[in-house]
């Protein structure tokens, strides 16, 4: 399982952004106009899109993404996505990897918010205006609407295929109305995020903050083998400030490459960006 990491441009855009479209967040396809050639949920997968030359199914060529049939009656195709957690989307990546003669020439992204999930009552706002798309490429686009949303509608013109859709942003959880007394403050779904690290050569660094146990050795944070003095580090921003009562460090599936030991430091700051990142970040060692 090869997990896709954000393009370099996305990482430079802002530390701490998470992919709100990830199934890890509980995000699902709500509805779709047409996914005859390739089912829409594939578009949200965390894995790197692949091309398998000799793979076909009952409807034709198998593609790793969402692909609609060819339109003959005008109009355009769309896909509505229900976010697992409400959030503010700051950057969108429409990836047409491996779609060369069947990519959509254009796309537009709209967003909305619904308390009851009734699509018919949603007021849609433009997140990304109509843009031209190219074949087999990332299309990184800055958001035009920076308010909390939980529904996203990807419109493609007129039809075609999208390998992956990434919605980078911040989780917006209403902590004032939570019923539980204990929370996993570092979880992605709680608004936790990775602010920085010295190395993440293998695996998926965001899996470190995902719910449940890792599925394989690739479903976690792993650094390259260190040949020089020092140690590896990662900085996590919690979803909200709080008191840490218990910490779990799970090395599931890491057998010959688990860390010998670790240490954890805590820090309270109103702006992590002002503190800098790295082993000298400071804080209280626990």
Which role fits each region the language model picked out?
Residues 88-98, 154, 244-253:
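A short beta-strand element within beta-rich, extracytoplasmic domains
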Residues 114-117:
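Short loop/turn segments immediately following beta-strands, especially the blade-tip
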Residues 160-170:
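Edge beta-strands of jelly-roll/beta-sandwich modules across compartments, strongly enriched
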Residues 268-273:
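Conserved small/polar residues in nucleotide/adenosyl-binding loops
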Residues 280-286:
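Hydrophobic alpha-helical segments, chiefly the membrane-spanning helices
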């Amino acid at each position: 399982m090869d997990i896709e990491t954000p393009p370099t441009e996305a990482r430079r855009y802002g530390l701490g952004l998470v992919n709100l479209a990830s199934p890890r967040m509980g995000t699902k396809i709500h509805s779709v106009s047409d996914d005859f050639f390739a089912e829409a949920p594939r578009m949200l997968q965390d894995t790197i899109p692949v091309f398998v030359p000799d793979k076909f199914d009952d409807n034709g060529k198998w593609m790793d993404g969402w692909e609609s049939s060819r339109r003959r009656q005008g109009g355009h195709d769309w896909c509505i996505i229900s976010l697992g957690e409400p959030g503010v989307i700051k950057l969108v990546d429409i990836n047409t990897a491996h779609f060369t003669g069947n990519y959509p020439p254009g796309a537009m992204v709209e967003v909305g918010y619904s308390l009851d999930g009734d699509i018919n009552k949603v007021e849609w706002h433009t997140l990304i205006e109509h843009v031209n798309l190219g074949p087999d490429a990332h299309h990184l686009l800055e958001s035009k609407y920076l308010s909390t949303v939980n529904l996203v509608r990807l419109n493609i013109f007129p039809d075609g295929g999208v390998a992956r859709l990434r919605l980078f942003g911040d989780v917006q959880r209403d902590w004032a109305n939570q019923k539980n007394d204990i929370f996993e403050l570092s979880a992605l779904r709680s608004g936790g995020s990775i602010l920085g690290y010295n190395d993440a050569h293998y695996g998926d660094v965001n899996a470190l903050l995902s719910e449940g146990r890792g599925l394989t050795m690739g479903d976690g944070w792993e650094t390259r083998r260190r040949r020089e003095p020092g140690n590896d580090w990662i900085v996590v921003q919690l979803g909200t400030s709080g008191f840490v009562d218990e910490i779990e460090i799970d090395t599931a599936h890491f057998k010959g490459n688990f860390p010998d030991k670790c240490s954890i430091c805590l820090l309270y700051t109103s702006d992590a960006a002002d503190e800098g990142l790295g082993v000298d970040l400071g804080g209280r060692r626990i």
